[in-house]
Curated annotation (Swiss-Prot):
InterPro entries from the UniProt entry: Dehydroquinate_synthase, DHQ_synth_AroB, DHQ_synth_fam, DHQS/DOIS_N, DHQS_C
Residues binding Zn(2+), per UniProt: E183, H246, H263
UniProt-listed Enzyme Commission number(s): 4.2.3.4
GO biological process: amino acid biosynthetic process; aromatic amino acid family biosynthetic process; chorismate biosynthetic process
GO MF: 3-dehydroquinate synthase activity; metal ion binding; nucleotide binding
CDD domains: DHQS
Cofactor list: Co(2+); Zn(2+); NAD(+)
Protein name: 3-dehydroquinate synthase
Keyword set, alphabetical order: Amino-acid biosynthesis, Aromatic amino acid biosynthesis, Cobalt, Cytoplasm, Lyase, Metal-binding, NAD, Nucleotide-binding, Zinc
Similarity field: Belongs to the sugar phosphate cyclases superfamily. Dehydroquinate synthase family.
Top-rank taxon, per record: Bacteria
Gene name tied to this protein: aroB
Subcellular location: Cytoplasm
Length: 362
């Protein structure tokens, strides 16, 4: 087992990474008599809910659970209310613990519930997708979507622990594994050139879910994110760099309807658009743009815009992005592979040119 610590100004919490952690009662920092509400969905529940309940009950916990509908389109206030109803009907108080058992959607919605129920209860994240293991479960971002924009309603709320059991990836559809690799590649592209080179050497093993390679990869991603979050917990500085490709990607997700493209798929194409724009601005070389494209393609990820979207469709969605300040678009771009920066008020004509470069052609 590996342990990565997230060091914040006022406290710290561990990220446990290993194989078989869910069935080990020692993984859970909960004592006899504690109340627990597990938030999950039917897809995850069929594999792991009974395992987690059994481990918690062995510790003497009183365990309830609530099932949310599965999918990005259910990352809504309605799903949030289902959690509140379950907590209230079960007479859960401020001393309860919410466990988010699932992927990014479950983690975000359950996390927001923990942040807001009775003004805050303890949260444990148990991410079961690669994307949530390397990204969304770490760092305290919680949110639900609005029909006009992704993650528009939420809070920063840190978990007390993250438990990453790599065995959960064995039941993950290949498309979901590939989507998670987009966030993995992002870390190398923005902050760690050596890790990017390592990914070029090992991407095929990651696609094949080689256990040792996978554990090293997840640990490195969590360490990179933990370091960034420690410096900038509420995204006022360096943490914005973690959004490479996300402004373009969120436009894709919102325009197509949540869930038609997976988040990682949209981020993959978004990274290519950001790289194309960086090259237009004279930052990154065309050779490095090509390296990024080849690595994403080897991970079976899209690198061009959906054929149902026109370049002009992007900007209205992008201008509602949370990073927009005073009506000016702010984008994460690349100086080089391994070095990102935030560009302020980039000309819309250049943004459109970059999107056109990543548009499908017959």
């Amino acid at each position: 087992m590996l342990c990565v610590n997230v060091e914040l100004q006022e406290r710290r919490y561990p990220i446990l990474i290993g194989s078989g952690l869910l069935q080990d009662e020692r993984s859970y920092p909960i004592k006899r008599g504690d109340r627990v509400m597990i938030v999950t969905n039917p897809t995850v529940a069929q594999f792991y809910l009974d395992i987690v309940i059994y481990a918690l009950e062995k510790r003497g916990c009183v365990v309830d659970h609530v099932l949310l509908p599965d999918g990005e389109k259910y990352k809504t206030l309605e799903s949030l209310n289902l959690i509140f109803t379950a907590l209230l009907q079960g007479n859960h108080g401020r001393d309860t613990t919410i466990i988010a058992l699932g992927g990014g959607v479950i983690g975000d919605v359950a996390g927001f519930a923990a942040a807001s129920y009775q003004r805050g209860v303890r949260l444990i994240q148990i991410p079961t997708t690669l994307l949530s293991q390397v990204d969304s479960s770490v760092g305290g971002k919680t949110a639900v979507n609005h029909e006009l924009g992704k993650n528009m309603i939420g809070a920063f709320y840190q978990p007390s622990m993250v438990i990453i059991d790599t065995l959960t990836l064995n039941t993950l559809p290949k498309r979901e594994v590939n989507a998670g690799l987009a966030e993995v590649i992002k870390y190398g592209a923005i902050l760690d050139y050596e890790f990017f080179e390592w990914l070029e050497q090992h991407i095929d093993e990651l696609v094949a879910l080689n256990p040792e390679v996978l554990q090293h990869c997840i640990s490195r991603c969590c360490q990179i994110k933990a370091d960034v979050v420690a410096r900038d917990e509420t995204e006022k500085g360096d943490r914005a760099l973690l959004n490479l490709g996300h402004t373009f990607g969120h436009a894709i997700e919102t325009h197509l309807g949540y869930g038609n493209w997976l988040h990682g798929e949209a981020v993959s194409t978004g990274m290519m658009m950001a790289a194309a724009l960086s090259e237009e601005l004279g930052d990154i070389s065309i050779a490095d743009v090509s390296r990024l494209e080849k690595l994403l393609a080897r991970a079976n990820l899209p690198t061009v815009s959906p054929d149902t979207m026109q370049p002009e469709d992007y900007l209205p969605h992008m201008m509602r992005d949370k990073k927009v300040l005073s009506g000016k678009l702010r984008l994460v771009l690349l100086k080089s592979l391994g070095q990102a920066y935030v560009a302020n008020d980039t000309a819309h004509t250049l943004v459109l040119n970059a999107i056109r470069r990543c548009t499908q052609t017959d």
